Structure formats: C-alpha cells, structure tokens
Amino acid sequence: MHGDTKKIRVDFTGAPETMLATLYGRALEADADRPILGDTYAKELVQRLDYDWAKTAITAKNAPSVTIRSAHFDGWARQFLAVHEEATVLHVGCGLDSRFLRLRPGPGVDWYDVDYPNVIALREQFYPPGASYRLMSASVTELDWLSAVPADRPVLVLGEGLTMYLTKESGLALLRRVVERFPSGELQFDVFNRLGIRTQILNTPVRRAGARMHWGVDGPDEILRDVPGLRLLVAMSVFDAEGFRDVPRRYRVMARVMSLVPALKNMAQFHRYAF
C-alpha cells in the first residue's frame, strides 16, 4: 500500500457498500488472539478510510462470521493454484479484498480483480496493478469484459459474497460464459438459499447498505442443471467448513441448533465445481 496517511472518504450505497462490512470484519479479526484469517492488510486499509464503521454492525465478537468464509475460499484457491502453476484467476466482485496479497500466487498466474468502476478506482489507490496482477473496471454481469481475458490456460473463478446480489439470469449467464470460454478450470463461490433471500431484512449489514439480494440457490443440483459442463467437487454448509470449529463457542452452539432444520443449516453454502 502507499505510504500516504491521509484518509480517503468512501461513499458507496447498495451492494458495493456491503464490501465495507466484510472489510471491517477482517480488520477486527486480525487483532484476535487466535485469528482465523489474520488479514493485516484489511486492518491497514480500514485505518486509511473515512467511513462510519458502526454502520456495518460488525464487532469483534461477530467478525469471525465474516472471516471464516474468506479463510475457506483462501484454502480452496490455494489448492487450485498448487496444481496449476500456470493459470488465470478471475476474482469477481473482489471489493477491497486483499486475497492476491494473502495468497501471493507464483509468476505463472495472471490474476484479475474485477468489480464496479467506483470500487476499482478506490482499490487501485491501495493495491496498484503489476505484471501479473490486473484490475478490471466492469460489472461482472456485463460479459464483454471476459473478452479481454486470454483463454489459453485453466481458470479459477472465485466469487465470495457475490452470487446473492445477482439475478438468477445474470448469474447463470456469467457461469455459462466462463465454461464456454475457458478450456478448463474451477468455479468457487458461496450462495444463500431461498430462505436466506426471503429473510434478508434480518441481515443488518445488507439492510443498512440499502442492498438487495436476489438469487437464492437451495443446492448444487440447481447449478449443475442450468450450467452444462460442470462437475460438482464440493458443496457444504458454512457450519461444516473446517474453520468453523475455531469460531467462538456461542456460534458453534447456534450452528448445532440451526442444523436441526435443513433450510437453516443450508442458508449459507460454499460451492466448488470443475469443468
């Protein structure tokens, strides 16, 4: 990051504003005694931004609910990169995530962080592009941006906290286009089920940002049916993620209770597909 200490005012609304709640959760969790993610980049970035962080409703106590997801997708991405020394990574809806810096992929990996132009304009002040790291200003559902990405190697498409803000039609169109364009690769993303979409008013960061979630996915069969060429690798409830055992006890107790009802257990899911 740049050494300038002047704070930068941020003024996002809707879905882009929700990325600030995610960022703040990662920053707070970096100070935990036993952090799940340990994202010191997020901590530094929060100190550089002028924003009312109380609006996010994220606290040190509930921050692990954010970082368990980020840590899980870091792990899946590392697995992909470990067997694909030459690959393309499309980090769609990247927000202000420092994943490229956390993972530090090898020289054979071309990494693209993709998000709305106003998000990328802010992002490039802290994470400037380099030889193998590129920033792309685009709505991920306006698929012309994919034409600028070479399709000569395996691709990892990673969408954390993205799909639920897309419509079903635009989300499926994105997944289909990736499968059609690239020779092989993986899709890694999280989803909310339909109950999660119907009860989104209870999601404080989403409500306060004035964001709207649209696309609910009850299980991987829906994705496999609508995106030809995919093969399911893993689909799991967030409660079954490896890192969940490290969250505070009260969250583990809540998970045991919610897991008695399938629709509650599967409200938040992590999906991984190959093609």
Task: Locate each region found by the language model.
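Rossmann-like AdoMet
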Residues: 1-90, 94-136, 151-152
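A short, conserved alpha-helix within the catalytic core of class I
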Residues: 135, 165-178, 182-183
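Short amphipathic alpha-helix with an adjacent loop that forms part of the alpha/beta core around
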Residues: 143-153
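A short SAM/SAH-binding and catalytic strip from SAM-dependent methyltransferases
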Residues: 154-170
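Conserved beta-strand signature within the Rossmann-like core of class I S-adenosyl-L-methionine
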Residues: 156, 175-194
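Short, glycine-/aromatic-enriched active-site segment of Class I SAM-dependent methyltransferases
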Residues: 194-211
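Short alpha-helix
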Residues: 210-240
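Core SAM-dependent methyltransferase catalytic element
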Residues: 245-275
